[in-house]
Amino acid sequence: MAPTKYFHSVQLQQDKCQGCVSCVKLCPTEAIRVRNGKAEILGDRCIDCGACASGCPYHAFTVKTDTLEGLSKYAYNIVLPAPSLYAQFPANIPLEDIWQGLQNLGFDEIFDVSLASEYIACEIEKYLQEYTGGRKPLISSTCPAVLRLIQVKFPELIKQIMPVLAPVEAAAIYVKKEAAERRHLPKELIGVWFISPCPSKQTNIRQSVDVKQTELSGSFNLSEIYGLLLKNLGGEKKLHVRTGSSYGLAWGAYGGEIASAGIQEALSVHGIKNVYEILEQISMNKMPQLDYVECHACKGGCLGGILAAENKFVAESNLRKRIHNLHATEPDSRKETMAQTMVLEDFPKSEQYRKKLVPRPMMQLDDDIMEAMKKFERMEEVLCDLPGLDCGACGAPSCQGLAEDIVQGKAHEIDCIFKLRAQVHKLSQGMLELARQIPIYHEPKFLNNTEDDNQ
């Protein structure tokens, strides 16, 4: 059963909000309203995709992440850099310098997430080979914002989600167990940290939708870590970190999952609006020819996350150069290339740690079913009387959203400017008619005489 209270890393600073409704129109789940000149987030609908934050001209939205002070809570700290971090730097900066910079910031150990990506890619490939009889395409499970979007708007597609862990979750499970055994430490004293390019991954650490128990201790804002790394890159000691191949590195950009799993009939889509449109098509069973759809809420994939420091096009160029340079040193065969790096023992299998997604109840008009039906009928009546322009001037994202708010007692019909104008016109016509019925006033004669006497 879905929780009734949700944690959100995307938060609104109302003092900065100007009530411009830009965020209202951008939100894919209609989770924002503007009331009394300020935006409000509806927590049961928000999926922490960050679309509101990326489109707010007043920077009224912020993302709550962890700080490096949190390292002091643990005896041993492991950081999980992903390709999205490497992409912030030009390809001529060695990964060893970035890893050394992370150690200079206080981390004891580094584990490259791209290596975990290859294990997950193999799980995806195997599952597709054995998948028979069910609806296609299957939908990638690596983006938490997409999973939440499906929970809220497309619950019928939950059964088509690929049942594998996100690489960072699998990496966290592996490194904490392995480090605890190697360092002879209880797991509670080991901190495992992610450097996140987006808010949805931070939210998933605090309240996961697909992992029974995350082993991640928290995550840091990628742009903040990037700024610190610029001052701490490299050093005399060069760290050796076991890393993945070019196929694991490719997961940072859109299309990387498909390439690493060797899927032919597949589609890669990025940007929450585009993802929404594709999910609508899948929901109507219009893409049965596809085996797999790779979805990223952020434009450009994880490289376009709102917490990234570098422009997403520059970051993509940086990453693809790294991929090209690494691929030039590898065998031609994808499977042979990945076999050279996948040498870890007892890497976790997704089925042991993943939990089943459940729909998230979004629009519940009332706890009492009879009362809910009455409200629904009333909502339909109100909606029929609204203009249907979905202009957003009322503070709701659509006329249907306003109708729902009205029956819930959270808005009024005259919040619609067209209804307000009609009401004002009706009142003015009434006042005009009333004015016509009032007798014409004549000044008493003695007033005029008084004025003449004064002269």
Predicted features, each with a name:
Residues 2-3, 9-14, 18-42, 47, ...:
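Iron-sulfur cluster-binding cysteine motifs and their immediate structural context
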Residues 7-8, 122:
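Short gly/ser/thr-rich secondary-structure transition/capping motifs
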Residues 62-392, 397-455:
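Iron-sulfur-associated redox domains of electron-transfer enzymes in respiratory
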